[in-house]
């Protein structure tokens, strides 16, 4: 009887460890996804294009920024329509109409500015 209990306890411990490892792998893959922001080609994109999961650049007609929002960062309004031209880590390339590319980390802005 004690061996059955010990066996069941060991089985539950094994399942717990496996589920924790699987959950940690899921969290790691999601964080890697956010580290690589420019996966879906881009630029200014009047009707599509753009950065960050298919959004449309600076937002002419089709939105922009993150996940299809209007400017940069979830729903801001891009150029025509106000709002949204903020770069979390600073602007790494300024074009004719303002910031064309946001920096992916804070140190990149410092490196870019020292080159000018």
From Swiss-Prot:
Q: What start-end ranges are recorded for coiled-coil regions in this protein? A: none
Quote the subcellular location field of this record.
Answer: Secreted, Extracellular space, Extracellular matrix
Q: Which residues form the signal peptide?
A: 1-24
Kindly name one Pfam family recorded for this protein.
GRP
Ranges: sequence repeats: 54-59, 62-67, 68-73, 75-80, 81-86
Q: Where is this region: Disordered?
A: 27-83
Task performed by this protein? Regulates the function of the receptor protein kinase WAK1.
Matching PANTHER family? GLYCINE-RICH PROTEIN, NODULIN-24
- Know the name of this protein? Glycine-rich protein 3 short isoform
Protein's organism: Arabidopsis thaliana (Mouse-ear cress)
């Amino acid at each position: 009887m004690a061996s059955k209990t010990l066996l069941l306890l060991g089985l539950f411990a094994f399942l717990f460890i496996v589920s924790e490892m699987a959950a940690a792998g899921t969290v790691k893959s999601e964080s890697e996804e956010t580290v690589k922001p420019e996966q879906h080609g881009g630029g200014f994109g009047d009707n599509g294009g753009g950065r960050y999961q298919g959004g449309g650049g600076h937002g002419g007609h089709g939105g922009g920024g993150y996940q299809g929002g209007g400017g940069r960062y979830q729903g801001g309004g891009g150029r025509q329509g106000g709002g949204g031209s903020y770069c979390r880590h600073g602007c790494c390339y300024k074009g004719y109409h303002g910031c064309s590319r946001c920096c992916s980390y804070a140190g990149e802005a410092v490196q870019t500015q020292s080159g000018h």
